[in-house]
Regions:
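Asparagine-centered strand-capping/turn motif at beta-strand->loop junctions
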Residues: 318-335, 343-345
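Conserved, mostly hydrophobic/aromatic
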Residues: 54, 120, 176, 217, ...
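Chitinase-like catalytic core of GlcNAc-active glycosidases
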Residues: 22-32, 57-172, 178
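Substrate-binding surface in catalytic domains of secreted glycosidases
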Residues: 130-237, 241
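Aromatic-rich peripheral "rim/lid" segments of glycoside hydrolase catalytic domains that contact
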Residues: 75-80, 282-323, 336
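Intrinsically disordered, low-complexity Pro/Gly/Ser/Thr-rich segments with frequent PxxP/GP/PP motifs
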Residues: 348-392
Length: 407
C-alpha cells in the first residue's frame, strides 16, 4: 500500500520535532471525569511502578450557543507535575472550523494545567484532515518559549492513513497514535458489529509502520455498550461508561462489546505490533467493565490469558459461619456461571444466604444447604461474596467448582 523506504525518507527530511525515530514506551489512558481516592491511588501506584506513561483527560472543548468552553476533570494538581503524564485534550469537529483560534485555546488551556506534553483527540472527518494539519502546526508554531519543550501527540483513525495530507499532520507531531478499536453504529440489532475488526486492524498496523516509525496503537481494555429501543432500532453507543438499567428507558436492550482476547493476543505476537496505549487504566473497586491489570500485562508479554473463575471459602465473621467468595479472572463476565458446592463431611444441614445477585439453583429448602449456586457477573479481578452459610463444617473441607455448561 505504501512504499516504506520512500515515505519514511520523505517524512524524515521534513524533520520530526522531537528527533526521536521510535517510540518505545507504552501507556494507559486515564479517562475518568470525576476522580475518586481509588482513581488517584491507582494512578500514583502506576507512576511509582514506572513501566507505563499515563495519558490523562485534561479537558474537553465544548460549544454552547456558539460559545466555546472547556469542561475539565477534577485531576489533582500534583498529577500534572509528573514527567510521565500527558494531558489529553478532546476537541469536537467544530474546532476545526477555525484551526488558528482552536490552537490558541489549546495552548491557553495547557498553560492553566502547567503541561507541555499534550495529545489531541479529535474524531476528524477525512475531508478535514487538512484542517487537522493546520491545528497541530498552529499549536507548534505558537507554543510559548517559556512553557517547556512541547511534546505534541494526536490520534488517528485507520481511514486517515491513506490520505495525502496525513503526512503534513505527522510532520508537526512527536507522537502519533492509531486507534484500532471503535464501533460504527448499526441501524438495528440485526446488523453485525464488532469492537475490533481483524482485517482493519492489521491493514492499519501495516500502513502506520509504513508511514511513520513513531506510531503507537490504542487498544481497548474496556467494554463498550450499544443500546437499542424496544423495536430494535439503534439508540446510543456508550464508549466511556455503562449506564445502569434504571437509567435507561423501559424496553431498552443492551448489547455489550467486550475486547476480543484472541485478536489482542494475535496483535501482540505479530511483528506488526506497536507500543500500546490501553483505553483505559483499570481501577480496582471502581471499574465493572474493564479487564484487570494482570490480563493486560500477560497480553503485552505475548501470552494468552485464560478466562477462569477462582473460588475461596473462608471462616465468617461469626462462629459457625462461612463465606463463599468468587473472582472472575481474565474476562469481563456477561452472563455469570454456575458453581457446584461440596460442603465436606458435615452433611447438608445448615442455612445459606446468597449475596450480590447470586442465587440458589433449584428450590431453596429451609435448613438445607444448596448443592449448586448461580454466580452473578461481577467486576473482572474483584473478589466478591457469593453468599454466607451457617454450618458446622470446617471451611477447609468445603470446596466450589464451576459446572460445565449443560451439566
Amino acid at each position: 500500500m505504501f512504499a516504506v523506504v520512500a515515505v519514511f525518507t520523505a517524512l524524515w527530511c521534513l524533520g520530526h520535532p522531537s528527533g526521536v525515530s521510535v517510540s518505545a514506551g507504552s501507556g494507559f489512558y486515564v479517562w475518568q471525569r470525576h476522580w475518586s481516592d481509588k482513581v488517584e491511588a491507582v494512578v500514583c501506584a502506576e507512576l511509582e511502578a514506572g513501566t507505563h506513561d499515563l495519558y490523562v483527560l485534561g479537558g474537553e472543548l465544548e460549544y454552547e450557543n456558539g460559545l466555546a468552553r472547556w469542561r475539565g476533570a477534577n485531576v489533582p494538581g500534583h498529577v500534572w507535575l509528573h514527567d510521565r503524564i500527558t494531558a489529553v485534550f478532546r476537541l469536537p469537529v467544530q474546532a476545526l472550523d477555525n484551526p488558528g483560534v482552536s490552537a490558541a485555546r489549546v495552548i491557553s488551556h495547557a498553560g492553566t494545567r502547567g503541561v507541555h506534553r499534550i495529545q489531541l483527540d479529535v474524531d476528524v472527518p477525512e475531508r478535514m484532515i487538512g484542517r487537522y494539519a493546520e491545528l497541530v502546526e498552529g499549536i507548534r508554531r505558537r507554543w510559548p518559549v517559556g512553557a517547556g519543550k512541547l511534546r505534541l501527540g494526536a490520534t488517528f483513525l485507520p481511514c486517515h492513513l491513506g490520505l495525502k495530507e496525513v503526512r503534513r499532520v505527522l510532520a508537526a507531531l512527536d507522537e502519533p497514535v492509531i486507534q484500532l478499536h471503535g464501533i460504527d453504529a448499526p441501524k438495528n440489532r440485526v446488523e453485525t458489529w464488532a469492537l475490533m475488526k481483524r482485517r482493519t486492524v492489521f491493514r492499519a498496523l501495516r500502513a502506520a509502520r509504513a508511514l511513520d516509525g513513531r506510531f503507537k496503537m490504542a487498544l481497548p481494555s474496556y467494554a463498550y455498550v450499544l443500546t437499542f429501543n424496544a423495536d430494535g432500532g439503534f439508540r446510543r453507543l456508550y464508549a466511556e461508561g455503562l449506564p445502569d438499567n434504571f437509567d435507561l428507558p423501559p424496553g431498552t436492550v443492551r448489547e455489550i462489546a467486550v475486547p476480543d482476547l484472541d485478536l489482542l493476543h494475535e496483535i501482540f505476537t505479530s511483528p506488526l505490533r506497536l507500543p500500546v496505549i490501553w483505553f483505559r487504566l483499570p481501577v480496582r473497586g471502581a471499574d465493572r467493565w474493564c479487564l484487570e491489570r494482570e490480563t493486560l500485562s500477560l497480553l503485552e508479554r505475548g501470552e494468552r490469558p485464560r478466562a477462569t473463575v477462582e473460588f475461596t471459602v473462608r471462616r465468617g465473621g461469626r462462629e459457625g459461619t462461612v463465606d463463599l467468595i468468587a473472582r472472575y479472572r481474565h474476562q469481563i463476565p456477561l452472563l455469570g456461571v454456575t458453581a457446584a458446592v461440596d460442603w465436606g463431611t458435615c452433611g447438608m444441614e445448615g442455612e445459606f444466604f446468597p449475596l450480590n445477585g447470586c442465587r440458589v439453583m433449584g428450590d431453596a429448602v429451609h435448613g438445607q444447604l444448596p448443592v449448586s449456586v448461580s454466580i452473578a457477573p461481577f467486576a473482572c479481578g474483584e473478589p466478591f461474596l457469593v453468599g454466607k452459610a451457617i454450618t458446622g463444617a470446617d471451611p477447609r473441607r468445603i470446596s466450589m467448582k464451576e459446572k460445565e455448561k449443560g451439566k
